Amino acid sequence: MTADQIRSLQPELAALLESFRPYMNRASNFGHLLAYVLGLLADLKRKSIEPIALAAGTAVRTLQEFLSFLDWDHEAANDHFQRQVMDRHGCERAIGVFDASGHVKQGRMTPGVQRQWCGETGKTDNCVVGQHLLYTDNHPTNPFNCVLASDLFLPKEWSEDRKRCSKAGIPDDMVHRPKWRIALDQLRHAIGNGVRFWFVTFDEDYGKVPAFWSDLDALGQQAIGEVPRNFHVFAKRPACRSLQRAHGSKRVDNLCRFSPVFRNQKWRQVTVKETTRGPAMWEVKAARVHLTDGSTPSRPTERQYWLIIARNPETGEIKYFISNASASVSLEDMLTAAFARWHIEMWFERAKQEAGFGAFEVRTYRSLLRHWLCSRLAMYFLAAQTQRLRGEKPGDHAGTSGRSDQHAGDINLETHLALAG
């Protein structure tokens, strides 16, 4: 995008960001925020601090200081962001999606960098991993998507090296937490800011943890998530405590294959999402089961959950899902939420391409969080503008679901400018 095109976006972006001014503490900081977000939206080969500063005509050191130590409250700004999303785009059937994203980085100085699994490359790599929470209205033709929270996953090796943490500006009380615990903290915080989700959904890295389910229950949050085939459940609660194998928990793949409650069912076709090629249909069976108690794995939970087996009739792919939804919730609704995970995958892809989400070159924890916030605000701007230019009203499609051929936040800036003109 040319310098003229960047300037043409500035009034609309400034208007959207105006409500964040109180958290900038100084007028100059608001100017830096605007310059940095505009730079993230620009068509630059690299979207790290130096090329953004050069394109904006700002001193490189100024933007470095803006991210690292200038006095503005990025945490309060993010709280405001969450409240604003609910005020302007809230809907009754909003879905929250948990996922982690890896960013390949060299060296040892970037906070949290380590050889670990990196989804970006599909292998163990030197990378930084973030844990994120996405909000989507799951609209079939123009979904509104934005990431409400981003936090650093701190590896154990970092957590145990407090000197290294101190050099990276990582707080003394910040320790290693598994991604599912970070996700729960993000959800609690968002709920505190008025965010409400019809369902939250996630992959098996979260779903395989019984304690994750019990904590979601404690929050009163309806959820559905994928689980691995060796996840254990109880088909029913034993009448009394028993150590007999026949009364124990079973792998979900074996239960779905051999238990009469599944064998006696016929496969039922369910539309899980709408695509440009028409409805995506999967065959499903479902039953009510008990999970293993997180504190005592040999004991079943008091409450029941849904166990759903879903089969793609075209490829034969099998997925297993657990849901804490009530017995009255339909399979269609549960699977609509379960198959909404694609929104965050596409958001990551577009955010890295369009808004420099993974282009950070920082050495402090605060700088990393601030970069992620600015990138998320850039994506929010695109999503809000796309929705406005297409004549949508927030929450108009609260009862709809499915996949889109185009999605908010996915529009490139040349298209945006053409629509704006």
Region spans (language model):
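Short amphipathic alpha-helical "interface-anchor" segments enriched in bulky aromatics
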Residues: 98-102, 206, 256-258, 329-362
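Short, basic/hydrophobic alpha-helical segments
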Residues: 80-85, 174-198
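Electropositive nucleic-acid engagement tracts
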Residues: 25-29, 36-108, 115, 212, ...
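Acidic, metal-coordinating catalytic cores used for nucleic-acid/nucleotide bond scission
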Residues: 202-209, 229-231
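Basic, amphipathic alpha-helical segments enriched in Lys/Arg and hydrophobic/aromatic residues
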Residues: 355-417
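Short, conserved catalytic/metal-binding motifs centered on acidic residues
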Residues: 52, 92-106, 133, 200-206, ...
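An anionic, glycine-rich sequence signature occurring as long contiguous blocks
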Residues: 14, 139-164, 168, 172, ...
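Active-site-proximal, Lys/Arg-enriched surface segment
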Residues: 68-156, 161, 292-296
